């Protein structure tokens, strides 16, 4: 069942990206439904471009889209956080039922499902919000790269159709990417090489690729990642999560100590 769900999720994700991978010019005469969605996004950005400032339109529309998707993001992050919290216990179960013996695999799956139910965790709850978000964000990205009237104009003296010659936007995009990834991983129960690599590799990739992208696209990346930093600090603040976790450990330790003291007193009375 687990493998089927993973495969289904992968198919949905791949399908979304394949549908959105066209590169040709998009206009009001474009034939496909996807291109009409992309064009609708572009017209919305144009409508928000007060004083014909496409850069301002990109910023406002990106903020609106990210704000609308905040509940989905919050659902995704809370589910991921719950999964992180029970990871140590899941590893203990995997040690208890090692190997690929069918009986062990069945017992492992049963105990994992019982744990998920007891903790109110759905291991796939973080996948569905992501699958909904990706096509929306990809449509916004394609609106900036495939619709002609969004490729022109300036923003703070930057030509939106050209790479930023001062490298200000690429640096900001990389910085906010780093901050969002670092904050997301800071509260992880268990750190691993993959998380560490993601924290540093993703900003580097964004930085390098931004040197050659049009400033309008990099402006979108910058605003989107800056908003994500705001979302994390507002809804899933890692410092608060760590504080709550440490408090829970402290309370559990004090309870354990009280139980031990009570047992010692009871033992002395019996003597």
UniProtKB/Swiss-Prot annotation:
PROSITE patterns: PROKAR_LIPOPROTEIN (PS51257). It is a multi-pass membrane protein. The gene is yidC1. A lipid is attached at residue 21 (N-palmitoyl cysteine). The keyword Lipoprotein applies. This is Membrane protein insertase YidC 1. HAMAP family: YidC_type2. GO terms for biological process: protein insertion into membrane; protein transport.
């Amino acid at each position: 069942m687990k493998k089927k769900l993973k495969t289904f999720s992968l198919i949905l994700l791949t399908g979304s990206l394949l549908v959105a991978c066209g590169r040709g010019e998009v206009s009001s005469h474009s034939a496909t439904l996807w291109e009409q969605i992309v064009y609708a996004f572009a017209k919305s950005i144009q409508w928000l471009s007060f004083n014909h400032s496409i850069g301002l339109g990109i910023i406002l529309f990106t903020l609106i889209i990210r704000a609308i998707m905040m509940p989905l993001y919050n659902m995704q992050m809370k589910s991921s956080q719950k999964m992180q919290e029970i990871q140590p216990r899941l590893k203990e179960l995997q040690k208890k039922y090692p190997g690929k013996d069918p009986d062990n695999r069945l017992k492992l799956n049963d105990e994992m499902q019982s744990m998920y139910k007891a903790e109110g965790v759905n291991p796939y709850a973080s996948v569905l919000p992501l699958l909904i978000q990706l096509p929306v964000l990809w449509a916004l990205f394609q609106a900036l790269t495939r619709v002609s009237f969004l490729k022109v104009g300036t923003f703070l003296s930057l030509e939106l159709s050209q790479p930023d010659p001062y490298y200000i936007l690429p640096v900001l995009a990389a910085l906010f990417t780093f901050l969002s990834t670092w904050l997301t991983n800071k509260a992880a129960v268990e750190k691993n090489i993959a998380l560490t690599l993601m924290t540093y590799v993703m900003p580097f990739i964004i930085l390098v690729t931004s040197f050659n992208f049009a400033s309008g696209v990099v402006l979108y990346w910058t605003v989107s990642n800056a908003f994500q930093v705001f979302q994390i600090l507002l809804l899933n603040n890692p410092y608060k999560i760590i504080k709550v976790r440490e408090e829970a450990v402290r309370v559990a330790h004090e309870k354990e100590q009280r139980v031990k003291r009570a047992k010692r007193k009871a033992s002395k009375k019996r003597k």
